[in-house]
Amino acid sequence: MAPPKKTVKKMDLTSFLNDDTFGSSWAEEDVDLNKITIPIETANANTIPLSELAHAKNNSNNTRSGGFGGSFGGRSRLDPALGGGSSDRREEYPVPDAPPYRAVINNIPWDITPEGVQAWVEDGLVKPEAVEEVVLPKNLRDPTRLKGNAFVTLKERADLVAVLKFNGTKLNERTVYVSVAAPRRGGGADVDWSSARGSNFQGDGREDAPDLDWGAARGSNFRGPRREREEVDIDWTAARGSNFQGSSRPPRREREEVDIDWSAARGSNFQGSSRPPRREREEPDIDWSAARGSNFQSSSRPPRREREEPDIDWSAARGSNFQSSSRPPRREREKEEPALDWGAARGAQFGKPQQTKNTYKDRSLTNKKTTDEQPKIQKSVYDVLRTEDDDEDEEAEKQNGDAKENKVDAAVEKLQDKTAQLTVEDGDNWEVVGKK
């Protein structure tokens, strides 16, 4: 079953704001501030004794300090609102009777220069060259900015007294305050500690800190700094026992090194270092040529002469049939076939039509064709790169080939002569073998 539809009533914004069905807005109700109460819990910790209030009042009237008084500059340690007025005032120093006569000018402009401060002081005194030195300390966190004060050293005491009258005057439309600078301690840097309370400046010669009443500042239960304890002379003999012997005995003497006879310790056959050191062996002069063989040639032979690089015409060497122009091309030698009388060598039956002989004849013709059809040796394109040594080797091979050919020709001629002397006669006791 479907849930029943909710009835929705539409109204405009004005009707909605003027609708008081559920009451008016809580923001329009008037609140009586006098009826608002704040509960305050009373405890012993929040109760301030009257005697302590009177003591804090007296300290606020009688104590002067440069930042921290007997009770935080005249305020109560429990509630600062119960104390008197603030006593954070700069300490005033008297005019010194001996140099240096230094004055401090506070709240100077940020864009002032030492020359500007010197001119301002001398113009006020109407006395040129009255200023001896001007120092403008810079901010440690930002060295590009000044710290806000200047230390002016004057040559005469009367000028310092006159400069103090410039207090509260204008310097570049800015009110400045002039006072006697604190005396230097140990030749340290010029630091205005009253204006540098919140800085992290650490000078070389820091001024002595004022004697502050830290006990009143930290509470009644605060204990001051511990004093250094004196070293107690303890009787260690009683602590160590009745049989302990003090340090009255003389110190131990150093033991002398014993000269040990290591030869006896190492054995009866040990020989010490008394024998002379071994002499170095001389290297024998070995005849390496005899050791390497009878055919070895030493390096005393003259160096090989450098070969002259031939002037190669590479443009002419691009073709396959390139022939060097330095010498005529070598002609191919044709082998001379000896004229043999094969008829006399083969017998009386030579020339008859026989199948076997025809077969051998065809084979001999084939071998002859093969010999005739052997490819001729062609010169390579790189034949031009051959050097003189290659030519010499080629000439030697050529001579060896000619000698071998001459030997073959002589053997063939000898065989021909012997073959020519053969005769096939019936009376020569030749046996004819026929087919079976």
From Swiss-Prot:
GO terms for cellular component: cytoplasmic stress granule; nucleolus. Residues 101-183 form the RRM domain. It comes from the Eukaryota. Sequence repeats lie at residues 190-210, 211-232, 233-258, 259-284, 285-310, 311-340, 341-350. The keyword Signal does not apply. Keywords: Initiation factor, Phosphoprotein, Protein biosynthesis, Repeat, RNA-binding. Residues 56-98, 185-406 are annotated as: Disordered. GO terms for molecular function: mRNA binding; ribosomal small subunit binding; RNA binding; RNA strand annealing activity; RNA strand-exchange activity; single-stranded RNA binding; translation initiation factor activity. InterPro entries: Nucleotide-bd_a/b_plait_sf, RBD_domain_sf, RRM_dom. SMART domains: RRM. Changing N106 to S/P: Loss of function. Residues 329-338, 359-376, 397-406 have a biased composition (Basic and acidic residues). The modification Phosphoserine is found at S65, S71. This is Eukaryotic translation initiation factor 4B. It comes from Saccharomyces cerevisiae (strain ATCC 204508 / S288c) (Baker's yeast). The gene is TIF3.
